[in-house]
Amino acid sequence: MPRLHAPLQSATKSTSAVSTRVALEAYPGLLARELIGNTSYKSDDKAKQTPERLIARKQLLQALEMGQTRLGLRLKLSHAQHDTLVDDASGDSLDAVLCMVQAAWAQAQNEAGDEHYGLPACDPLEGWIVSAV
């Protein structure tokens, strides 16, 4: 999977060729809820970084690795990557992975011929969250 980079937006018009950059909006909580319901898996407050949240992060990663999402993708991680994600009680790294999975799904939709990256018809100013139904 190619490395993801944040697109740079410019307020000025470009005279160069048409850009191939695409900005997609992902929402990690959407995919997390699909996999573990409303179970909390993260907290910035050290006092709330509980064993229950650790278990939830493990369950979330297991579901991603087993391909249990409706997106039809499986996450492949090294042991070190898995451990790093589980150990990040803030959930920031895991949120980034959830967004990456959503972006990978959108890219797969585009490669399969969907010029809208799997997004339904929507207001171009409002946009749509990738994989939101």
Q: Across the structure, where does each feature detected by a protein language model lie?
A:
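RNase H-like (RuvC/DEDD) metal-dependent nuclease/polynucleotide-processing core
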Residues: 1-133
